[in-house]
């Protein structure tokens, strides 16, 4: 005779446990939204800065469009993502206050504080770009765009490994990421200069024929 399989209902969770899971779920959602906004925002800064190299009226049209996109992204997506992330983190600590005694959490909060500074600095850069006061080049913004990647890696590793974080492996990983990012930025800059030189030569050749 085959054994009968009985369906059993899951045991009800306590209110604090349920609250913890809800806070954690929305904390993760907030992180995804926040980082997506930060990555795209600084990418828009790159395009905004590079628009200065375009002839009129394309230059003015592009800069106004990027300014509008930056404001909407920062105010509607990035900042709400940051608020949800921080608010849900506070909720997690409220449901599990003993976690404040963990050394890894203090380090993680330090990197989160750096990320918050980065967030508000991006807001300041956005205003300078809108006012035409930013002196940053597209290549410099590309470098700035890589900063949250490093912070994200460290924060996630701390959240996963906690006090067992392998420092040697983490250090080498960060060094490798920095080298790879710097190399990609330099390669793109070289390609862009080569493309611009080729375009200039083609324009000169076309003018000579006319």
Swiss-Prot record:
The keyword Transmembrane helix applies. GO terms for molecular function: metal ion binding; protoporphyrinogen oxidase activity. InterPro entries: HemJ-like. Belongs to the HemJ family. Pathway: Porphyrin-containing compound metabolism; protoporphyrin-IX biosynthesis; protoporphyrin-IX from protoporphyrinogen-IX: step 1/1. GO terms for cellular component: plasma membrane. Heme binds at residues 27, 108. It catalyses: protoporphyrinogen IX + 3 A = protoporphyrin IX + 3 AH2. Its main location: membrane. The lineage of its organism: Bacteria, Bacillati, Cyanobacteriota, Cyanophyceae, Synechococcales. Its cofactor is heme b. The keyword Metal-binding applies. The chain crosses the membrane at residues 22-42, 74-94, 103-123, 141-161, 165-185. Disruption phenotype: Attempts to disrupt this gene in the wild-type background of Synechocystis only allow to obtain heteroplasmic disruptants. These cells accumulate a substantial amount of protoporphyrin IX. It is found in: Cell membrane. Catalyzes the oxidation of protoporphyrinogen IX to protoporphyrin IX. Is involved in the biosynthesis of tetrapyrrole molecules like heme and chlorophyll. Does not use oxygen or artificial electron acceptors such as menadione or benzoquinone. Is functionally coupled with coproporphyrinogen III oxidase (CPO). Is essential for growth. Its EC number is 1.3.99.-. It is a multi-pass membrane protein. Keywords: Cell membrane, Heme, Iron, Membrane, Metal-binding, Oxidoreductase, Transmembrane, Transmembrane helix. Binds 1 heme b (iron(II)-protoporphyrin IX) group per subunit. This is Protoporphyrinogen IX oxidase. It is an enzyme of class 1 (oxidoreductase). Homodimer. Can also form higher oligomers, most probably tetramers. Interacts with Sll1106, however it is unlikely that Sll1106 is required for PPO function. PANTHER family: PROTOPORPHYRINOGEN IX OXIDASE (PTHR40255:SF1), UPF0093 MEMBRANE PROTEIN SLR1790 (PTHR40255). GO terms for biological process: protoporphyrinogen IX biosynthetic process.
